Regions:
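GNAT-family acyltransferases
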Residues: 1-141, 197-208
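Alpha-helical interaction/dimerization surfaces of two-component signaling modules
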Residues: 52, 159, 183-187
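Solvent-exposed beta-strand sheet faces enriched in polar/charged residues
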Residues: 104, 170-172, 192
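Conserved acyl-CoA
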Residues: 124-128, 151-168
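A short glycine-leucine-enriched loop at secondary-structure breakpoints
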Residues: 136, 145-152
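Conserved beta-strand-loop-alpha-helix junction that forms the acyl-donor binding cleft
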Residues: 140-141, 169-181
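Short glycine-rich hinge loops at helix-strand junctions in the catalytic core
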Residues: 147, 164, 188
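Conserved active-site alpha-helix within GNAT-family acetyltransferase domains
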Residues: 150, 175-193
Length: 208
């Protein structure tokens, strides 16, 4: 049995107000487990996001993301103010956050917080970009590695492009994060060797 996604009719426009989440689809995985795909993030989702970002036992998350600083120690409101559009995958029975993704304007090749210098961090809120939009995604235990992310992110991309059809998407991260970069490749992203940072082992991939 393959994953199936059943869209929920809606007429939402972006950006959504802060702490707003609307169901846009039902996701049923290959084992028959049901999830809600949410556009936006309400306070319940953000609370889970913060808790998971602070979980130091999740070494994959801590080693490969800036979420401990971004969501655990930082302001969600400030992050959202940068034009971010979040999507959440929420397990229906337990209401647990299974995966989280976001899009938003960001200059091509601009690294995440984990890789920025102090001077670059001070400029983070002053970026002006319209053409290139970043895509970032996370999956959380115990749902990581269960075959959910490809279909979830593919659906999120299609939804986001309805609102921003001219946007060029890019992803970036640790070149050794085979799962994340492999997913990007399966989604049609292509590596940009000219943006590879050998010192920080950071790479970018684009989908134009």
């Amino acid at each position: 049995m393959a994953n199936t996604i059943t869209p929920t009719p809606h007429q939402l426009s972006l950006p959504l107000p802060l702490y707003t989440a609307e169901k846009i689809a039902t996701f049923t995985d290959s084992r028959g487990e049901s999830f809600d795909i949410m556009l936006g993030a309400d306070e319940s989702i953000v609370q889970q996001l913060r808790k998971k970002s602070l979980d130091t036992t999740d070494t994959d998350l801590q080693d490969n993301t800036s979420d401990f600083k971004r969501f655990g120690g930082g302001s969600y409101e400030e992050w959202y103010s940068k034009g971010r559009t979040p999507f959440a995958l929420v397990h229906q029975a337990s209401v647990a956050l299974a995966a989280f993704a976001w899009f938003g304007p960001k200059p091509l090749g601009r690294k995440s917080l984990k890789y920025l210098s102090e001077a670059e961090l001070k400029e983070e809120l002053n970026q002006k970009e319209k053409t290139w939009h970043t895509l970032v995604y996370r999956s959380y235990l115990p749902y990581r590695g269960k075959g959910l992310m490809g279909d979830f992110i593919r659906f999120a991309i299609a939804e986001y492009r309805k609102h921003y059809p001219e946007a060029k998407l890019w992803v970036g991260g640790n070149a050794d994060n085979a799962a994340s970069m492999g997913l990007a490749e399966r989604l049609g992203f292509k590596r940009r060797d000219d943006l590879f940072d050998a010192e920080k082992n950071w790479m970018a991939m684009v989908q134009e």
